[in-house]
Amino acid sequence: MISLHNLIWIDLEMTGLNPEQDRILEIATLITDANLNIIAEGPVLAIHQSEEQLKLMNTWNIRIHTANGLIEKVRKSTLNEETAAAQTIAFLQEWVPAGKSPICGNSISQDRRFLYRYMPILESYFHYRCLDVSTLQELARRWKPKIMAGIKKKNSHKALDDIRESVAELVYYRAHFLLLSSNI
């Protein structure tokens, strides 16, 4: 059900980290309520990229995305960025009005750079604010490093898996790092 308080979580897998030369391989979204309960998972979309573009990937990306099957999905996909953005927006419209949810995820400013470049209509669907779990990760690592042992990640580098891990990580920080009080 549509709500102003729902949060949009997104993750992209890319050919690299430079939006000037690299491209989006996969996009996934999910919706949580304000209490971080996952209430809907959006489409997981592999985006076709040319062989020339795939050959520009560094060895790390080739190794990871070959092992997780993403390169093969990208080769078989018929979707381009515009179509993937439209399908994602169609899902988001069922859950959150445009301009209301911050963009949520891990190192989300990196994903936003790619959205701005290749899926500007989707990027504009988000509020200008962001909810970046990596901020809490960096603070916890410095201020309360012992809690970091409680965070378990598979590092599958599949977009939907990564988003689920981001939500779980924020739930963990809420319980073990943030001091929440009902008296305030």
Curated annotation (Swiss-Prot):
GO molecular function term, any single one: nucleic acid binding
Domain Exonuclease: 7-170
Entry keyword annotation includes Nuclease: yes
Domain of life assignment: Bacteria
Cellular location(s): Cytoplasm
Annotated transmembrane regions: none
Keywords: Cytoplasm, Exonuclease, Hydrolase, Nuclease
Catalytic site: Y128
NCBIfam families membership: PRK05359.1
Family: Belongs to the oligoribonuclease family.
Function, in words: 3'-to-5' exoribonuclease specific for small oligoribonucleotides.
The protein, known as: Oligoribonuclease
Origin species: Baumannia cicadellinicola subsp. Homalodisca coagulata
Gene: orn
